Amino acid sequence: MPKGEIVLGCLAPHPPHVVYAENPDQNEPVSEGGWETLRWGYNRLARKLKTIDYDALVIFTPHWQTYIGTHFLGLPEFKSKSVDPVFPNIFRYNYDIKVDVELSEIMCEKASEHGIITKMMRNQDFRVDYGTITSVSYT
């Protein structure tokens, strides 16, 4: 694969309800299902990713815009429990996200060069957005 080639792009809704509906072990509440069409879409994406040669998965979630600027994860691992402030009874999810910090730093630098307000998040206690957690859990 040539260096720097984008091999796939997708736009994926990522409400935390999707994870809740799957009843994964790491989510505390349980559900009786729901959101099937969206869950099937994520399952299809996961199958597609298994057929593609790629080095990194980049997730951009617009929810981070509610903070100031665009944030990039700047530690090798973010591991915690996410309790969503809007849906605390639905989304209490234990996550463990691995980060390619070098790639994240380069993306942050390039975005900044193009006039985007950016920040590297190097605080281990930073609350990772549920859009990222939802997307990572399915891919």
What is each residue range found by the language model?
Residues 118-130:
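Short, surface-exposed recognition loops or helix-turn segments adjacent to catalytic cores
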Residues 139:
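Conserved small/polar residues in nucleotide/adenosyl-binding loops
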